[in-house]
Amino acid sequence: MLRTMLKSKIHRATVTQAYLHYVGSVTIDADLMGAADLLEGEQVTIVDINNGARLVTYAIAGERGTGVIGINGAAAHLVHPGDLVILISYGTMEDAEAHAYQPRIVFVDADNKPIDLGHDPGSVPLDISVAAELFDPRIGAR
C-alpha cells in the first residue's frame, strides 16, 4: 500500500511579494528550500493563515538569503504580501517507509530566516517568539 505523507513544511512564513501576471508558482528563498528539502518544480500546498485560502502550485528557487516568499500568477488574488503562510509538500511512499519517515519541519522568523528545524509535525518549539501563540495538539493551549 502507498501512503501520502507530510514530507516538508515551512511554518508561518511571511509573503514578501505577489505578482499576478506571471505563469504561476511560489518563489521560495533557496536557503529555505534546502532546509525544507524542497526541489524546484515540486508540488507545494500553500495555506494562508490570514484568510484560510488553500492552493496547490509548484516551487521555484528564489535568491538565497533574501527570505523571499513570492506568490505568482492567479494565486496572487488569494494570498497577499504580509500574509502568514504554511508551505507544505507531501510524498508518496510504501507503508514501511512511511512508518519510519521523518519530515522536514522549518519554523521561520518574521524575516523568513530558519529559527527551528525539526521532524515532528505536531510539535511547537518552546524557544521561538511565536510559541505562545501556537496550539500544540498533543498538550493543548500553552
UniProtKB/Swiss-Prot annotation:
PANTHER family: ASPARTATE 1-DECARBOXYLASE. One of its GO terms (molecular function) is aspartate 1-decarboxylase activity. Its cofactor is pyruvate. GO terms for cellular component: cytosol. Pathway: Cofactor biosynthesis; (R)-pantothenate biosynthesis; beta-alanine from L-aspartate: step 1/1. GO terms for biological process: alanine biosynthetic process; pantothenate biosynthetic process. The modification Pyruvic acid (Ser) is found at residue 25. NCBIfam families: panD. Keywords: Autocatalytic cleavage, Cytoplasm, Decarboxylase, Lyase, Pantothenate biosynthesis, Pyruvate, Schiff base, Zymogen. It is an enzyme of class 4 (lyase). Binds 1 pyruvoyl group covalently per subunit. Heterooctamer of four alpha and four beta subunits. Belongs to the PanD family. Is synthesized initially as an inactive proenzyme, which is activated by self-cleavage at a specific serine bond to produce a beta-subunit with a hydroxyl group at its C-terminus and an alpha-subunit with a pyruvoyl group at its N-terminus. Catalyzes the pyruvoyl-dependent decarboxylation of aspartate to produce beta-alanine. Its EC number is 4.1.1.11. It catalyses: L-aspartate + H(+) = beta-alanine + CO2. It is found in: Cytoplasm. The active site is at 25 (schiff-base intermediate with substrate), 58 (proton donor). This is Aspartate 1-decarboxylase. HAMAP family: PanD. Substrate binds at residues 57, 73-75.
